[in-house]
Amino acid sequence: MSLKEKTYSVLVVSASQNLITSMHDLLSGSKYETVKYTASVSSAKRANLEKAYDIVIIDTPLPDETGDDLAIDLSTNEASIVMMLVHYDLYDEIHENYSKYGIFVASKPTSDEILAHSLNWLESARERTRSYEKKTLSIEDKMQEIRLVNQAKLMLITEKGMAEDEAHKYISKQAMDRCVTKGVIANEILNK
C-alpha cells in the first residue's frame, strides 16, 4: 500500500490565522481524514483526549503556554508524530533540546512548499511508527498464544498424566493434523 492510500488525522495548534489558512489548503486532500485546528495548549489537550492524532503541528508560542510541554507529552506518551514551528532565531536551541524526544522542528517564517515537504516527512515518520505498532501487536499475539499453550500443557500434564514433552507433541500434532494454530488447540483443551 503506497503512502497515497494511507490516511492521517492531524491536529494543528496555532494562534496564527496565516498558518491556519496555509495548513487548511495543504490538508484539504483526501489523505487527511480528520483535521482539527485549535489555538491554545488547553484546547489541544482536550482535542487529544477525544482522539489521538497521527500528526500534530504546534506553532509556538501559543497564548496560554509555549507549547513545549505539549510537544513532549504527545511525542512520548502517544503515537503522534509532532512538529514544532519555532522562530528562526530559536531553531538551533529548540532542535537541540527537543530532537531527543523525536520532535521535528522547523523554523518560521516558512513557506507553503516547506510546510508541504514537512508534512511528507511527518507522514513517513508516522508510517514507520505504524509498522512498529503492528510488530508489537504481532509479538503480543505470539506471547498470548505461548501462554495458552503452556496452560493447556499444564492441564494435560495434571489431568491426563502426560509428560511435558508428550503434552507439547500432542498439541503440535493436533494443530498440524487439523491445519490450525497451537493456540486454537490450546483453547479447545482449556475449554473442555
Spans of model-derived segments:
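Conserved acidic segment of CheY-like receiver
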Residues: 6-18, 23-27, 56
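Conserved phosphotransfer microenvironments
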Residues: 20, 44, 54-75, 89
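Short hydrophobic/Thr-rich beta-strand motif most characteristic of the beta2 strand and flanking loop
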Residues: 33-40
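Alpha4 helix (beta4-alpha4-beta5 surface) of REC/receiver domains from two-component response regulators
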Residues: 69, 88-104
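A short, hydrophobic beta-strand element within the central beta-sheet of small alpha/beta folds
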Residues: 79-89
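C-terminal output helix
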Residues: 110-119
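The C-terminal output helix
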Residues: 120-134
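C-terminal output/effector regions of signal-responsive regulators
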Residues: 137-192
